[in-house]
Design a protein with these regions (language model features):
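Amphipathic alpha-helical and helix-coil boundary elements used as assembly
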Residues: 2-354
Length: 354
């Protein structure tokens, strides 16, 4: 009978079984270096979304059933995926949850949840007031506070405002009321139509042993900031190990009925009257061949909180409120509903997509 003893180093154990770990399509690296020789990545599942960040589930194996789960929590991790062009595409994050699973006496399963550093914002709630600041100023202030108070946050995320192309109103008063930092920041950015994206400082690496770099929180208000893949064209084709390139395997178009007009109003103290958007702004998007937008009559009528006011002498440096703020909300909501009405969803095997 052949008896194989499992060494403490998981990679040595894999080599003993006749498998070469270094030639695999996925590699993992921990900032807690003691884990690198104990944990072997078997499978990765996850999502990466605009305005939602990164969340990954890593299924790992180890020859040790007694790794303290606290060794995983708060550790930075990088997963390198070999693409169809033999390049290493990196995705990283922070381990926020760790589970230990079944063991057959030789190998033990560990499941790790990896999120981008903004996940830490979900664990701080606050109430505070910001005076004479724009939305971008407030986000920058909170970001700087996190960098000062949390070494983990400071070492894992930087703020990138190069994707902002517009000037934003300086508001006299912004309040965070019993809100999580994540909810507060998302609310402010949404009010100005600013998207955020978690990006890698170094998306492609030359070696899986390269140090883990901080990710970037990119603030974006212009679609020109999004870059297409270098390959430009992707085939619609079956997925197979014998194919030379990755492909799109499924493509679905979807339409759904959405509001056809938006109308917003709020109280304007400067003029002592209700200030409205430009009437009921009807969508230019054609929702149906059977009914036009006017006959559908699906209006979203919103009443917002009163417009802000400057100090009596107008010396506080804030932006004067006016119809422009209402028009911006009208436009943003209208564009949102138009995008929801018509969507395309693709499933692919493209490993360097982001």
């Amino acid at each position: 009978n052949l008896i194989i003893t499992m060494p403490n180093n998981i990679y040595a154990a894999i080599e003993q079984l006749g498998l070469t770990a270094q030639k695999r399509a996925i590699h993992i690296q921990f900032s807690n270096t003691s884990l690198n020789e104990q944990v072997f990545l078997q499978r990765i599942d996850g999502t990466h979304e605009l305005n939602a960040g990164i969340e990954l589930q890593l299924l790992c194996l180890s020859t040790s059933a007694h790794i303290p789960l606290k060794q995983f929590i708060g550790s930075q991790v990088a997963v390198d995926i070999v693409t169809d062009k033999s390049e290493l595409n990196r995705i990283s994050g922070i381990i926020t949850k760790a589970d230990v699973g079944a063991s057959d006496g030789a190998l033990t399963i560990y499941r790790l949840t990896v999120e981008d550093p903004t996940a830490l914002w979900k664990h701080r709630r606050n109430s505070r007031v910001f005076m004479a600041k724009s939305v971008v100023d407030v986000v920058q202030t909170i970001f700087a506070e996190w960098q000062q108070r949390s070494p983990l946050f400071a070492s894992s995320l930087t703020l990138d405002k190069s994707g902002l192309s517009k000037e934003y109103d300086v508001r006299p008063f912004i309040m965070q009321a019993n809100e999580l930092d994540s909810e507060f920041i998302q609310r402010l950015l949404s009010s100005e139509g600013i998207n955020w994206l978690i990006d890698e400082s170094q998306l492609k690496v030359s070696s899986s042993s390269e140090p883990i770099q901080p990710q970037k929180l990119r603030l974006i208000d212009d679609n020109a900031q999004y870059q297409s893949l270098e390959r430009q064209n992707i085939r619609f084709h079956r997925s197979s190990a014998v194919e030379s390139s990755d492909s799109i395997t499924n493509f679905v178009g979807q339409r759904s009925i959405q509001p056809t007009s938006v109308h917003i109003q709020h109280w304007q103290a400067n003029t002592l009257e209700i200030e409205e958007g430009a009437g009921s702004v009807q969508s230019k998007h054609s929702h149906s061949d059977n009914q036009d937008n006017a006959s559908l009559g699906l209006e979203q009528a919103w009443h917002f909180s009163p417009a802000w006011i400057q100090d009596l002498k107008g010396e506080d440096g804030t932006t004067k409120s006016g119809n422009g703020q209402i028009e911006k909300f009208n436009q943003n909501l209208g564009h949102y509903y138009d995008l929801q009405a018509k969507q395309f969803m693709a499933t692919s095997t493209v490993r360097d997509a982001q």
